[in-house]
């Protein structure tokens, strides 16, 4: 396929996400993924061999999404390049979540300006932890941690797998990410059934999470923070999430992490950074700016990789 036809869907899809985010009135494939996962979990997460059943479900769902996307992409390309471009553009648009997350984080800070209770309710939309007892500082911290972590999950990682395996790889990654967000918890209900979903998510996010942190410190013009990120990025229950969070903590000179409640259970997480200063709206604006610059850098990098791949294949 001509290089322009490979790169055009990426640029258009990214610009659409930049302008529109995820409109509530549009059906989203991740919602379908979620229903499929909920169906499988309901029927399989019971009785014996839960770990095996959870692993098989995850593998079947991920490979199934990849194969279906690969088949559709190739069939549409055979029919007409224009159809292929439309399909790829729509998938890329749906798989990127940069704008929606930024809107949600801004909404958290605006809600906090009205009341603590509104802030708690708003942040509950984007975090998995229990929010009913969070202080205003903890609400702001949760929002900014999520902004950093989901720059990786919602933008950098999807683009990384797009660059490596094309649109099928990008969609398969979204299935991995959705599986982890729904069943990848260490609670009594999910610790056996969802452990392989969590392990797969750890593997596919290993490089993107560290790349995200690198892009963030470059975007901030603070490459000397690399040692801080490497040292503090390991202070997290996740092998990956700590790196983008450490990058933002270093950029803002603040502290993330600490103990949180999930589904009523206390998880004692280490701290990232040491400066426990109050977070402000200005910090949120700085974090959003860093996200956007890192996003642009990743789009450029993805275009270069896809262009080189196309040139080599030709």
Language model regions located:
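Hydrophobic alpha-helical transmembrane segments
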Residues: 1-171, 184-314
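Pseudouridine synthase
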Residues: 174
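Substrate/ligand-engaging "lid" and interaction regions
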Residues: 177
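Glycine-rich phosphate/dinucleotide-binding loop and adjoining beta-alpha-beta core of small-molecule
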Residues: 180-181
């Amino acid at each position: 396929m001509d290089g322009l036809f490979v790169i055009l869907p990426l640029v258009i899809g990214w610009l659409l996400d930049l302008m529109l985010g995820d409109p509530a009135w549009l059906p989203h494939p991740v919602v379908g993924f979620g229903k499929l996962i909920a169906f499988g979990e309901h029927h399989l997460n019971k009785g014996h061999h839960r770990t095996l059943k959870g692993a098989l479900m995850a593998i079947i769902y991920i490979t199934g999404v990849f194969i279906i996307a690969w088949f559709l992409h190739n069939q549409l390309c055979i029919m007409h390049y224009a159809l292929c471009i439309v399909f790829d553009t729509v998938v890329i648009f749906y798989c990127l979540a940069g704008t929606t997350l930024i809107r949600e984080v801004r909404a958290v800070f605006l809600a906090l300006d009205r009341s603590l209770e509104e802030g708690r309710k708003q942040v509950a939309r984007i975090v998995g932890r229990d929010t009913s007892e969070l202080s205003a500082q903890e609400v702001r911290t949760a929002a900014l941690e999520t902004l950093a972590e989901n720059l990786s999950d919602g933008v950098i990682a999807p683009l990384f797998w797009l660059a490596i395996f094309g649109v099928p790889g990008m969609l398969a990654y979204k299935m991995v990410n959705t599986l982890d967000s729904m069943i990848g918890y260490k609670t009594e209900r999910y610790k056996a059934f969802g452990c392989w979903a969590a392990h797969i998510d750890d593997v596919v996010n290993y490089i993107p999470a560290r790349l995200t942190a690198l892009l963030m410190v470059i975007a901030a013009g603070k490459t000397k923070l690399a040692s801080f990120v490497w040292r503090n990025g390991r202070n997290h229950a996740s092998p990956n999430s700590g790196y983008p969070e450490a990058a933002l903590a270093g950029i803002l000179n603040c502290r993330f992490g600490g103990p949180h409640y999930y589904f009523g259970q206390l998880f004692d997480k280490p701290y990232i950074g040491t400066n426990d200063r109050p977070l402000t709206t200005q910090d949120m604006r700085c974090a959003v700016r860093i996200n956007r610059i890192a996003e642009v850098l990743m789009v450029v990098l993805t275009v270069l990789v896809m262009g080189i791949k196309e040139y080599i294949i030709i």
